[in-house]
A protein has these predicted regions:
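Nucleotide-activated sugar donor-binding and catalytic core shared by glycosyltransferases
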Residues: 1-431
């Protein structure tokens, strides 16, 4: 089966080059160390008989942040050496900022084609490999088997679309899954999906979602919150000031227009709702600004420095600040969930920070977490823009309900922790 993959990879990759170059230029990524993607990572001496070198691959920012408790626990073991790879430029940046003192090396993951993958394997020389969530790189997995190195998929999940794709691929998918030594699923339903696709019962276990174990950041101090509000052009909170903030977290095209419309409508109804838009792709700032120019609302673009006047809307076009903006907010809308979007973005961060959370019907990629938040009365699911407007208006008018949802979120988080420890226990046999 690996030969079929290799034959298909090259023409698909060649056809994709224009898009890859356009995408990299548009997002300003891969300016440094792009050669890693061709396997040109630094040579590492073989690990000693008393130590284990673990190669962890986490595709982007969300996964890089999610593995923090795991990396901290593994790096504390004197017999363990870690090498971390990631796929995206933003993930690479966050990895260096977060893990420089915890890992032996941080590189870009090689393109999954035999010459690049083999070169990276010859240079990294791992004793054990970990893949995050749904990353199944056939060549990487093949090299693990070829080198007799165990490989595990952790925090494993399958979106609806990926599950359907793997079902259609049939034998190719089964051969990949059979090469995995361990699959630690993020939920019971995800474990069932993997088993349906042909994984072995003894190697497939639900352990929970390790993202629930990521420590919540310390709350913003009063002074820090006041300073941040001032920088953004938002009024300071007080008993007399009834200003409320809605954060649109990781929004996609079309959703910003809906949130702007809702903000306008509530302002006209006498509700002082301010909006922080954090687009999933920050390079879309010009498109969002164009939407705002057709309104009477004042706005500020975060990357341009501190606001010089009071504004109704902030375009938060910076990376690494979403957590602060969620903390500053009273309500959080999770992006990529309103029609026509269907996949959703992770709602965990809003939940773990104790914020009432809203999302549309399209949460297929985070179905289990979304359902859990709904059942715990933390989140509210809406069908469309009008339903979102009604729900936001109701929550703005009901502070007790907002506070109750926040308390529910804290209880939910405590109840869902422990996946990192269960993951460590499960992989111990390979170390």
């Amino acid at each position: 089966m690996i030969w079929a993959y290799r034959i298909l990879f090259l023409p698909v990759f060649i056809l994709s080059i224009p898009y890859i170059l356009w995408h990299a230029k548009r997002r300003g990524g891969y300016k440094k160390d792009f050669h890693h993607k061709f396997g040109n990572v630094p040579y590492r001496e073989p690990s000693s008989s008393q130590s284990k070198r673990i190669w962890i691959q986490a595709v982007s920012v969300g996964e890089i942040r999610a593995i923090k408790p795991l990396i901290e626990a593994l790096s504390a073991k004197p017999e363990v050496e870690l090498v971390l790879t990631t796929t995206t430029s933003t993930g690479y940046k966050i990895a260096h900022e977060t893990y420089e003192n915890h890992v032996a090396g941080i590189y870009y993951f090689p393109l999954d084609f035999v010459p690049f993958t083999k070169k990276a394997w010859r240079r990294i020389r791992p004793d054990f490999c970990l893949l995050m969530e749904g990353e199944l790189w056939p060549e990487h997995i093949h090299q693990a088997k070829r080198n007799k190195v165990p490989i595990a998929l952790i925090n494993a999940r399958l979106s609806d679309s990926t599950y359907r794709l793997y079902q259609r691929l049939g034998g190719l998918t089964r051969s990949i899954f059979k090469s995995l030594d361990l699959i630690l699923a993020s939920s019971d339903s995800n474990a069932t999906r993997f088993l349906d696709l042909g994984t072995r019962q003894e190697n497939t276990k639900p352990v929970g979602n390790i993202k629930c174990d990521v420590p919540a950041p310390p709350p913003l101090g009063d002074g820090e919150a006041i300073a941040l509000r001032k920088e953004l052009g938002l009024p300071a909170a007080s008993d007399k000031n009834q200003t409320l903030i809605l954060c649109g977290a990781s929004t996609w095209k079309g959703e910003e227009r809906s949130l702007i419309t809702i903000c306008e409508a509530l302002q006209k109804n006498g509700i002082d709702l301010r909006l922080i838009i954090t687009p999933r792709h920050v390079e879309r700032r010009k498109d969002i600004e164009a939407e705002l120019q057709n309104t009477s609302l004042k706005y500020h673009i975060r990357s341009r420095g501190s606001a010089t006047e009071d504004v109704q809307i902030v375009i938060a076009d910076t990376t690494g600040e979403l957590t602060k903006f969620i903390q500053l907010s009273d309500l959080v809308f999770v992006g990529r969930s309103l029609p026509p979007h269907t996949g959703g973005q992770t709602p965990i961060e809003a939940g773990m920070l104790g914020k009432p959370t809203l999302f549309g019907p399209g949460m297929a990629n985070f179905r289990d977490i979304a359902r859990s938040l709904l059942n715990a009365d933390i989140a509210t699911q809406v069908e469309d823009e009008e339903a979102l407007r009604i729900t936001v208006e109701e929550l703005c008018a009901d502070p007790e309900k907002r506070q109750a949802k926040g308390r529910n979120a804290q209880a939910w988080l405590v109840a869902n922790q422990g996946a990192t420890q269960r993951t460590l226990e499960a992989i111990q046999k390979f170390m």
